[in-house]
Amino acid sequence: MKKLKVTLLASSVVLAAALLSACGSNQNSSTSTKKLKAGNFDVAYQNPDKAIKGGNLKIAYQSDSPMKAEWLAPLSDDATFGSMSSPGGGQDGLFFTNSSFKYINGGPANVSLYKDAKTATITLRKDLKWSDGSEVTAKDYEFSYDLTANPAYGSDRWTDSLANIVGLSDYHAGKAKTISGITFPDGENGKVIKVQFKEMTPGMNQTGNGYFLETVAPYQYLKDVAPKDLASSPKSTTKPLVTGPFKPENVVAGESIKYVPNPYYWGEKPKLNSITYEIVSTAKSVAALSAHKYDYINDMRASQYKQVKDVKGYKVLGQQELYISLMYYNLGHYDVKKSISVQDRKTPLQDQNVREALGYARNVAAVQAKFSNGLATPANGLIPPIFKEFTSPSVKGYEKQDLDKANKLLDEDGWKLNKSTGYREKDGKELSLVYAARVGDANSETIAQNYIQQWKKIGVKVSLYHGKLMEFNSWVDHMTTPPGSDDWDITDGAWSLSGEPSQQDLFSAAAPYNFGHFNDPEITKDLNDIDSTKAEDSTYRKAAFIKYQEDMNKKAYVVPTAYAINYTPVNKRVVGMTLDYGAMNTWSEIGVSSDKMATK
């Protein structure tokens, strides 16, 4: 199942599969039949019945925010739509991967890496077409770079990693009209692309590495749309071209997508006649499942697990999540002209002791125990445990509450407790911070207020942004619109990660997703070390990952919160369902064994 590099998620307690929607992406191969387990969950559902011909699969994505339809990957950062777009191609991903997230051949395109030449060659399938029957070309692959690197399109996916492509930084800065490092051996209308790098990195053979793009965009279809209008154009929102086994027949803004088979799909023809994919609110999802309205619902919350685990007619599947939730501190702004974070904000949070104290004051373990139903665990570092070769329990984070240590850190930093107010002061100023907490599920308000009370115990006054939780889409706009806002101090984030654990795209000085805009030479060195040629040695790379996590915990620019197991209740009429990371299948092979939902 394919993933984009990083994708924002709505809930910070525990998330379902995000882009790892229960049926993977458009790249389809045979279904895995291995009896895989994640914790106590089966990863796949082995339906004893065969699929009927045709049928309609009914899927929902649980969200309290509207669907933001954007069919161009460089212009989208929303996990909800990333999942909902997957029957049509998951915003048109290109490569197959195995269960270790390494590239394999056989998908819409193959990639070959040449270490000595410092190049990648991407070869598109000869029969790869858009859903209008037009050829997918080399120019369509380059166009994804145009969308990402040309500021006129408004993408927030430009990173230091992409700057490793020869000529792409000059193009991004407006110093060049073309990208010198991307060439077409067979011409723009051919099927071969060569990408020239400045340096090769050890993670380049992993999906989501961030050093080259994994998607295409239909250049001929979109070339006449003005860059400033493209993100909102019907051609990218409601009437797109796609490459997957299904194509959108109808897109209802904010609500739903109806898919029908794509007659120009290169692979196995779908078994289903149609797929409907809808938004369902957290308030209605459990009732909808109990009424057998959907075959499955993506992004069920951990807090709902007890309500859905025994609903008749469903099998609950699970998978270790490529997921990390964390707390951010607002430390600076993003310099758009220079594409770099500047850590210049005047705030008590510039003091490391204050950041650490806020981290140690949180009772994350108690929150997870109360609300996650065993589906989330406190995080000791920024790398999820599914990447067991790159993390270690020896990394010490903020998973255990330590109010004594938090108080000591603030005492050492000169923050004195005013006994009449109960809050700390320094140089005549109260330690008062704004918490931009956001809506995730029914427990979001309770969890936010809980953390505010924990911070009060150490004398830190924290109030919600404008006195309430932020709606998720508003929060995303607030955090991702450069140069950033000065009206918040603390926020939470949750990320659906890629198969390459390097976090250049999250925390490098150039990463727009570095919401707090910290810029630290030591962290930059750590990130670069992870991707250096020395890190081609797996032992060296693991040590580099551990050092990076230890340094991030020490400096506390962000504070890890939780890891998660995703679960998905699947109706027992569904055939060919798996959450296996190595399964590139299912949108063609998934089917139903009956026209009616199973109820027993």
Curated annotation (Swiss-Prot):
Gene3D superfamilies: Dipeptide-binding Protein, Domain 3, Periplasmic binding protein-like II
Bilayer topology: Lipid-anchor
Superkingdom per UniProt: Bacteria
Keywords for this protein: Cell membrane, Lipoprotein, Membrane, Palmitate, Peptide transport, Protein transport, Signal, Transport
CDD domains: PBP2_Lactococcal_OppA_like
Biological process terms in GO annotation: peptide transport; protein transport
Localization in the cell: Cell membrane
Keyword Cell membrane set for record: yes
Signal peptide: 1-22
Covalent lipidation (S-diacylglycerol cysteine), chain numbering: C23
Purpose: Part of the ABC transporter complex OppABCDF involved in the uptake of oligopeptides.
Subunit structure: The complex is composed of two ATP-binding proteins (OppD and OppF), two transmembrane proteins (OppB and OppC) and a solute-binding protein (OppA).
Name the UniProt record assigns to this protein: Oligopeptide-binding protein OppA
Native source species: Lactococcus lactis subsp. lactis (strain IL1403) (Streptococcus lactis)
Organism phylogeny: Bacteria, Bacillati, Bacillota, Bacilli, Lactobacillales
